């Protein structure tokens, strides 16, 4: 679990005020430290070993199952997360269907109160992605990447979110 030494609070705004200034986009762990970096490398090595062991099985099954192939390609960021419209991104992450449905009022509120921000939904499961694309056809819906530090880093570099909202607390080591 990453510890953040500084917390930046965004002040509440009055209705008459302009939106508050946004913080810099989230790109990397702000406090990696030696022990955290070492543990992340060990975890990444375990991912590489798992991919080497199970990669051929996934490749074989993916040849017969296009949905599985698409899932693997999206999770490894071989499919683009898409380009936004230039507004700062707020990443709303819900693991599956329940969290995506639960985020509905939050997303509506973002759209009505902060039209200067672009809500982007991310989900882990195929059913969550299907429901998100149905409920929010006007928003970008992306698959959360596999939990390898380089893949997660590329994901955050591509999206450059200003804020990440976790609908339900589910944290992986590289997130």
Tell me the role of every PLM-derived stretch.
Residues 2-14:
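Extreme N-terminal basic, low-complexity initiation segments
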Residues 8, 16-19, 49:
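N-terminal cationic amphipathic segment used for targeting or macromolecule association
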Residues 22, 55-175:
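Active-site and donor-binding regions of nucleotide-sugar-utilizing enzymes
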Residues 22-34:
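Short, Lys/Arg-rich, polar N-terminal cytosolic tail immediately upstream
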Residues 14-17, 29:
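Intrinsic-disorder-associated, low-complexity terminal segments enriched in Asp/Asn/His/Tyr and depleted
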Residues 17-20, 45, 131:
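Residue-level detector of intrinsically disordered, flexible termini
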Residues 32, 36-62, 74:
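Short hydrophobic helices that act as membrane-entry/anchoring signals
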């Amino acid at each position: 679990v990453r510890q953040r030494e500084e917390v930046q609070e965004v002040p509440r705004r009055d209705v008459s005020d302009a939106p508050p200034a946004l913080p810099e986009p989230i790109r990397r762990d702000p406090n990696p430290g030696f022990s955290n970096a070492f543990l992340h490398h060990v975890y990444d090595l375990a991912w590489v070993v798992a991919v080497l062991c199970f990669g051929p099985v996934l490749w074989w099954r993916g040849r017969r199952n296009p949905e599985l192939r698409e899932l693997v390609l999206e999770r490894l960021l071989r499919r683009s997360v898409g380009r936004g419209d230039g507004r700062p991104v707020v990443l709303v992450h819900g693991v599956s269907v329940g969290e995506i449905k639960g985020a509905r009022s939050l997303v509506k509120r973002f759209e009505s109160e902060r039209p200067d921000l672009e809500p982007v939904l991310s989900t882990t499961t195929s059913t969550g992605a299907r429901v998100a694309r149905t409920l929010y056809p006007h928003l970008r819906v992306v698959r959360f990447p596999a939990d390898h530090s380089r893949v997660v880093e590329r994901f955050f570099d591509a999206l450059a979110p200003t804020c990440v909202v976790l609908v339900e607390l589910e944290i992986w080591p590289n997130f």
